[in-house]
């Protein structure tokens, strides 16, 4: 233990953990870039997320099997929780995110999703009456001001589509925040890896069923580029970052891993500019600084009553 009472991390674990957390955050951020590239080939959100989940399903089933070895059998209550979390945390959050990316830039999408810790804070207050400190309130206001700054700039040239896209992505962030708030009990009982493997597998199946219900089978005929981009999305930007972040948390703890995630919005903006030729100007810089600073303060000061 350190003098401050926090657990000390061996230098080797600290370096490896920071590297894993950074790589995982960058890989997660690449998802929006790949989705935007795929949309250039005339595919829609329902079909695109179907292919992403089709290729991700075997990986998460394998993770669920590996994490379940020697573990107790799941009860009906466990399965109900897994299905519920799969719907909110992975199916609904993913679909709304993909849909929203049809209308807004990858940079704005990542900034909205990065508000997630503030949404968890608000849900904690609404559901459990956990107090929000004055510092956290100011930090949240700063974060949302940053998003509004970038949104206002984007709405000037995207029009009503920017409003729809931003609302869809914000809905995705809320859905994932609900998952985080309610997943605590199951994480303790099942373990993080087992829960992620099972809940994501549920979401994968739901995305496949959604395609069958909403689209003719002929809609599955897409450009080869969409297939390869979906494989890349499922592996490099979905499965791999989950593993990397979990390994990082084991080495450096959830708090430091979350703070390292600040690299996510910046990497998305950089990739958006370099790969998608998205705009980069003072509005985006200022908005990003506000969002990242506000979320850092929220995570830095923690949630009262959550420990």
What are these regions (language model features)?
Residues 12-18, 42-50, 74-80, 152-175, ...:
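Juxtamembrane helix-entry segments on the extracytoplasmic side of multipass membrane proteins
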Residues 25, 51, 108-115, 180-205, ...:
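Helix-helix packing/entry segments at the starts of transmembrane helices
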Residues 21, 36, 60, 120-122, ...:
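Transmembrane alpha-helical segments that form core, pore/gating elements
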Residues 29, 86-91, 95, 117-122, ...:
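Hydrophobic/small/kink-forming positions within alpha-helical transmembrane segments
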Residues 27-32, 61-113, 123, 149, ...:
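Specific transmembrane alpha-helical segments of multi-pass solute transporters/efflux pumps
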Residues 2-51, 87, 158-185, 206, ...:
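Glycine-/small-residue-enriched transmembrane alpha-helix faces in small-molecule transporters
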Residues 60, 83, 123, 132-154, ...:
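Hydrophobic transmembrane alpha-helices of multi-pass small-molecule transport proteins
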Residues 47-58, 89, 94-136, 172, ...:
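Specific alpha-helical transmembrane segments that line the substrate/conduction pathway
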């Amino acid at each position: 233990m350190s003098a401050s009472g926090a657990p000390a991390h061996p230098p080797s674990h600290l370096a490896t953990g920071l590297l894993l957390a950074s790589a995982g955050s960058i890989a997660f951020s690449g998802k929006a870039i790949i989705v935007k590239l795929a949309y250039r080939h005339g595919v829609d959100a329902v079909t695109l997320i179907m292919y992403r989940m089709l290729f991700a399903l075997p990986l998460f089933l394998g993770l669920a099997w590996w994490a379940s070895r020697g573990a107790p059998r799941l009860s009906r209550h466990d399965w109900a929780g897994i299905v519920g979390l799969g719907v909110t945390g992975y199916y609904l959050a993913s679909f709304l995110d993909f849909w929203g990316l049809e209308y807004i830039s990858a940079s704005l999408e990542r900034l909205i999703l990065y508000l997630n810790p503030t949404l968890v804070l608000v849900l904690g207050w609404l559901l459990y009456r956990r107090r929000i400190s004055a510092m956290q309130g100011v930090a949240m206001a700063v974060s949302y001001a940053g998003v509004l700054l970038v949104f206002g700039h984007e709405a000037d040239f995207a029009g009503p589509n920017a409003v729809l896209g931003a609302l869809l992505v914000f809905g995705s962030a809320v859905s994932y925040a609900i998952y985080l708030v309610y997943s605590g009990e199951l994480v303790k009982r099942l373990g993080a890896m087992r829960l992620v493997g099972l809940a994501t597998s549920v979401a994968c199946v739901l995305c496949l069923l959604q395609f069958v219900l909403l689209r003719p089978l002929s809609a599955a005929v897409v450009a080869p580029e969409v297939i390869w981009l979906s494989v890349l999305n499922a592996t490099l930007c979905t499965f791999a970052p989950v593993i990397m972040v979990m390994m990082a948390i084991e080495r450096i703890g959830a708090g430091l891993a979350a703070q390292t995630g600040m690299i996510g919005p910046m990497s998305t903006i950089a990739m958006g500019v370099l790969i998608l030729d998205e705009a980069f100007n003072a509005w985006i810089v200022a908005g990003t600084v506000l969002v990242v600073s506000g979320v850092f303060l929220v995570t830095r000061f923690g949630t009262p009553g959550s420990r």
